[in-house]
Amino acid sequence: MNLEEENTIFKPLYSLKHSPINAYFSKNSDDFVVRERPLYEFSGKGEHLILHINKKDLTTNEALKILSETSGVKIRDFGYAGLKDKQGSTFQYLSMPKKFESFLSNFSHPKLKILEIFTHENKLRIGHLKGNTFFIRLKKVLPSDALKLEQALMNLDKQGFANYFGYQRFGKFGDNYKEGFEILRGKKMKNVKMKEFLISAFQSELFNRYLSKRVELSHFANDFSEKELIQIYKISKEEAKELKKQEQFFKLLKGEVLGHYPFGKCFLCEDLSAELERFKARDISAMGLLIGAKAYETGEGLALNLENEIFKDALEFKAKMQGSRRFMWGYLEELKWRYDEEKAHFCIEFFLQKGSYATVVLEEILHKNLFE
């Protein structure tokens, strides 16, 4: 794969096989609602205020700027567990120094409300959340499409989903990763935060491409013969047989990096049979590479061969990035839906572990690219 020759936006493969489903989706505050779920209970004591806020059609940074102007707290002194999109209605938690509490007593803003205030010992940091609950309303849904949506949701609930990075990660034109690649190759940029963001977009792009390659492998393992798998992947007959034997959609590979799901340490897949049982029980999941010097390394085998195929253009820049691992396969939790035939509305609710994108799930369900 030559990143320099890429002129089109990469589109990851879907795991489900149905045709596109017709539905209208608008990411507004009535039809897209996100509720953050904290990682821990707030203690009720300490030097930090925890603000439970509801923002509508504001980014997290825009909300912080509004609160900063009201309270006098510098933006860098606020804490948050995750950055949220502008579109939609978001319920999330922010932290700020308690000594500024009095400045919030008369706070009022049409797009930002403070719902509750707690106290806690520490400032909120990125990742200090379990995940997010999402509400999505689809409109103009015909009864025939509602049936397709129900089937797609049941399939995803049963098998899980490919945990791609969402389009939000890649900028307005979907090509932030190219800027990140240029920075790694020596292009200067003074803005350190922007530089880090663009490099992370590059890492995310490669992650998505590798995960898409694994989704393709899983489809091929289901649809092709052992002989064809041997020819395509240059693997042994035993390896091809092992792939065909796996009943679940996403196929695990010996030597790849696994992790305890949803939080836990990385380890190599050595005993494939044993790990398959844990994978089916949703105790572990496969972990894709966010390339960098400190990322847990893949063992010998097909997983490493596929990794090298995707990451070959980036290997010389590995030392310039810290690197880590990210779950490739995730699961919908607390899933429910309802269809109002009279209004032609189809409403979906589910919980995702932190770092997963509801828009990725929606694209998988609809088989449509929301970016376009």
From Swiss-Prot:
**From which residue to which does the signal peptide run?**
none
- Please report which protein family the annotation says this sequence is part of: Belongs to the pseudouridine synthase TruD family.
Recorded GO cellular component terms are:
cytosol
Q: Which residues form the TRUD domain?
A: 160-330
Q: What does this protein do?
A: Responsible for synthesis of pseudouridine from uracil-13 in transfer RNAs.
Species for this entry:
Campylobacter jejuni subsp. jejuni serotype O:6 (strain 81116 / NCTC 11828)
Q: Which SUPFAM superfamilies match?
A: Pseudouridine synthase
Q: What is this protein called?
A: tRNA pseudouridine synthase D
